[in-house]
Amino acid sequence: MEGKFITFEGIDGSGKTSVLKGVIEHLNDKRIDNYIWTREPGGNRISEAIRKIILNVEYTEMDARTEALLYAAARRQHLVDTVLPALNEGKLVLCDRFVDSSVVYQGVARDIGVEPVIKLNEFATENLKPDLTLYYDVEPEISLKRISNNRQNQVDRLDKESMDFYHKVRQAYLSLAESNKERIKVIDASQNLDKVIDDTLSILNNFM
């Protein structure tokens, strides 16, 4: 039996990670344990080491293509060590970010181009695509305020990007969702957390 691969996407501060925690609580309450929860970049020893490089605030001079290559490298190892074994065991894989993040952040916001980023990640993932993607949409003004309020002592390199950068990321996500309506479901993340979790569970219940 093959598992299901569900990814959670959104700009930084969209609340997707908090929603994921709510989904995990729901699964645990229902005594559902045939799942894993993971993240990108990260999810295993090598990919977590790459994550530290990518997000290090000291590396503000990092070239956009270097960044894209590091994400792809972390993604490949994450798939091999974590995602694919779980899917082959028939598990539900809940992943905080996947290829869509690279498309919008590096492909669009960093101006590398969508096609080069897609091709790079096709190589890294061997064309593996999520069965379902949940995109948490929120205005950057709201998301960055959340970051400021909640992560004052944990600022990473991406938190230092401009408002214009995050507006580009958001618009890229919306365009991606528009062209992939079957796979990507848009959730209003400006609502309170409980409502966003309820909307998420409703979509997941219909999907499963």
Curated annotation (Swiss-Prot):
It catalyses: dTMP + ATP = dTDP + ADP. ATP binds at residues 10-17. Pfam families: Thymidylate_kin. One of its GO terms (molecular function) is ATP binding. One of its GO terms (cellular component) is cytosol. Its EC number is 2.7.4.9. CDD domains: TMPK. Coiled coil: none annotated. GO terms for biological process: dTDP biosynthetic process; dTTP biosynthetic process; dUDP biosynthetic process. InterPro entries: P-loop_NTPase, Thymidylate_kin-like_dom, Thymidylate_kin_CS, Thymidylate_kinase. Keywords: ATP-binding, Kinase, Nucleotide biosynthesis, Nucleotide-binding, Transferase. The keyword Glycosyltransferase does not apply. The keyword Magnesium does not apply. Belongs to the thymidylate kinase family. Phosphorylation of dTMP to form dTDP in both de novo and salvage pathways of dTTP synthesis. This is Thymidylate kinase. It comes from Ligilactobacillus salivarius (strain UCC118). The gene is tmk.
